[in-house]
Amino acid sequence: MSITMRQKDLRPAPALIEYKGMKFLITDRPSDITINHYIMELKKNNVNTVVRVCEPSYNTDELETQGITVKDLAFEDGTFPPQQVVDEWFEVLKDKYQQNPEACVAVHCVAGLGRAPVLVALALIELGLKYEAAVEMIRDKRRGAINAKQLSFLEKYKPKARLKHKNGHKNSCSVQ
């Protein structure tokens, strides 16, 4: 077995998180070598947007050729997002879910255990979950996700009705 294959086998599977009609796919970072496999996984989950919260390390041309938008919202590993990243995250969700309510938004950091799950947890909290339930939902599918510093941030986070269903349509959302 090659080293590359062993490393690939150790990677956690993408975690699909669904709540109130919104879908998020938490993944680890692809590479230029694994990008085609990554695109297949994204297509399988109806992803039209990838939010990259780590430093760029792969070429996004192939994703964009496939109609998948890449948005960079990098912030420091092991920490929680600054307010500007939080605001931009909710703008991305608003734009994408208004354009295509059935679509899934993928979000990744390096391992898919810290920064990416924190952004998804923020969305779940805005959709009405308590922080404990949001973290539990993510950890059920992404074991080891969210460190103590990030957990403390989520505990203190106050939802601001940024994601709210409109017209009773379960898949529509708006950012306020």
Swiss-Prot record:
This enzyme's EC code(s): 3.1.3.48
Cysteine methyl ester modifications at: C173
Keyword Oxidoreductase belongs to the record: no
Disruption phenotype: Viable. Results in delayed hatching, locomotor defects and inability to fly. Results in defects in axonal target areas in several central nervous system circuits. Results in axonal and synapses defects in two distinct brain neuropils in the antennal lobes and mushroom bodies, respectively related to olfaction and olfaction-associated learning. Reduces size of the central nervous system neuropil (a region of densely packed axons, dendrites, and synapses).
CDD domains associated with the record: PTP-IVa
Proregion residues excised on maturation: 174-176
BP terms from Gene Ontology: cellular response to carbon dioxide; negative regulation of BMP signaling pathway
Lipidation (S-farnesyl cysteine): C173
Catalytic activity: O-phospho-L-tyrosyl-[protein] + H2O = L-tyrosyl-[protein] + phosphate
UniProt subcellular location: Cytoplasm; Cell membrane; Apicolateral cell membrane; Cell projection, Axon
InterPro entries xref list: Prot-tyrosine_phosphatase-like, PTP, Tyr_Pase_dom, TYR_PHOSPHATASE_DUAL_dom
Active site residues according to the UniProt entry: C109
PROSITE patterns reported in the protein's UniProt record: TYR_PHOSPHATASE_2, TYR_PHOSPHATASE_DUAL
Topology with respect to the bilayer: Lipid-anchor
Domain Tyrosine-protein phosphatase: from-to ranges: 13-166
Expression sites by tissue: Expressed in the adult head (at protein level). Expressed in neurons in the antennal lobe and V-glomeruli (at protein level). Expressed in dorsocentral neurons (at protein level).
Enzyme class of the recorded protein, top EC level: hydrolase
SUPFAM superfamilies tied to this protein: (Phosphotyrosine protein) phosphatases II (SSF52799)
GO cellular component: apicolateral plasma membrane; axon; cytoplasm; nucleus; plasma membrane
Entry's Gene Ontology molecular function annotations: protein tyrosine phosphatase activity; protein tyrosine/serine/threonine phosphatase activity
Record bears the keyword Cytoplasm: yes
Keywords, sorted A to Z: Cell membrane, Cell projection, Cytoplasm, Hydrolase, Lipoprotein, Membrane, Methylation, Prenylation, Protein phosphatase
Protein family (similarity comment): Belongs to the protein-tyrosine phosphatase family.
Record text on subunit structure and interactions: Homotrimer. Interacts with uex, possibly at the plasma membrane.
Further comment: Compartment-specific localization and function depends on long untranslated sequences (UTR) in the PRL-1 mRNA.
Name this polypeptide is given: PRL-1 phosphatase
Naturally occurring in which organism (per UniProt): Drosophila melanogaster (Fruit fly)
